[in-house]
């Protein structure tokens, strides 16, 4: 049917200029007009010249996020790096459901140790995670924070406590902080710091630049760890030119616009509060709290989630 055909595309919705894409996650307040102008001014050069290889691009990624070059690998979207990492991790992977499916989809099902929070809104704490996985011990543990799709958020100090538990138990911790810049503790809660990566050398931090920086068309993401052997493996596992020139140039110029980005994050949090209040006025939606750039809602009578999605598409061109 109509809606399923759109969903099979996974993007490319510029072909339908009347459509509003509320399916894929972006930042409406970044990149800033100044950054876009600089990209436009260099369009011809970037279109017609080769990008750099991994050495230069990992240097740029390290500069953007304040981590050592040998601790970070940039990818053609975080999805490219997730694929490599999921193939590399051995044994059981602890996953909290519902989750971003790209991680479990890259694993054999019987290698997953699944925790489903028994709460109405899928809320959970660091203690809940530690409690469950103390009894169902994985070799690696995935934490998406804020979580996707629930928007659940574990505060920074509790994430560090979870990292300490993993270190003591010999569990490798994978933290996906793709949405952390939308949280109320930003910018003080990132794990992309040399001292933290060195304190927890088995910890891996994933960040999709598409989501929070509003540039999904660039296909850009990073993975960081003080496990330099793992990072070196990931760098070799991707193709020689895994980033295009536009993605490289974005990293090259980003620090000039970092203040704009932080201002956009403040503006977004204000808009999220307003949007949640308005969304909560809709009688057939129960809106759950979120620290990300989306809300998980329970669809109530008279609609099912599918019926509502189809109606929004057919009557209002909203995906």
Regions found by a protein language model. Give the residues of each.
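N-terminal "arm"/small-domain region of PLP-dependent enzymes with the aminotransferase-like
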Residues: 1-49, 136-137
């Amino acid at each position: 049917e109509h809606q399923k055909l759109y969903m099979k595309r996974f993007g490319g919705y510029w072909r339908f200029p009347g459509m509003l894409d509320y399916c894929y996650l972006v930042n409406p307040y970044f990149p800033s007009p100044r950054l876009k102008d600089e990209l436009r001014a260099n369009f011809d050069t970037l279109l017609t010249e080769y990008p750099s290889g991994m050495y230069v691009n990992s240097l740029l990624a390290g500069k953007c996020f304040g981590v050592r070059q040998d601790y970070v690998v940039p990818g053609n979207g975080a999805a490219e790096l997730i694929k490599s990492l999921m193939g590399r991790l051995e044994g059981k992977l602890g996953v909290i459901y519902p989750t971003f499916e790209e991680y479990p989809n890259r694993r054999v099902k019987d290698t997953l140790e699944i925790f489903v929070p028994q709460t109405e809104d899928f809320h959970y704490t660091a203690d809940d995670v530690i409690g469950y996985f103390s009894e169902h011990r994985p070799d690696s543990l995935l934490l998406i924070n804020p979580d996707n799709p629930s928007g659940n958020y574990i505060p920074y100090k509790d994430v560090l406590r979870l990292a300490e538990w993993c270190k003591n138990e010999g569990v490798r911790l994978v933290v996906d902080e793709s949405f952390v810049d939308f949280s109320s503790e930003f910018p003080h809660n990132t794990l992309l710091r040399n001292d933290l990566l060195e304190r927890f050398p088995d910890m891996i931090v994933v960040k999709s630049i598409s989501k929070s920086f509003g540039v999904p068309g660039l296909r850009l993401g990073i993975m960081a760890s003080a496990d330099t052997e793992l990072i070196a493996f990931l760098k070799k596992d991707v193709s020689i030119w895994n980033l295009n020139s536009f993605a490289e140039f974005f990293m090259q110029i980003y620090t000039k616009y970092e203040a704009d980005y932080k201002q956009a994050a403040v503006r977004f949090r204000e808009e999220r509060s307003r949007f949640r209040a308005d969304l909560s006025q809709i009688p057939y939606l129960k809106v759950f709290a979120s620290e990300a750039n989306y809300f998980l809602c329970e669809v109530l009578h008279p609609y099912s989630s599918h019926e509502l999605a189809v109606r929004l598409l057919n009557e209002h061109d909203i995906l």
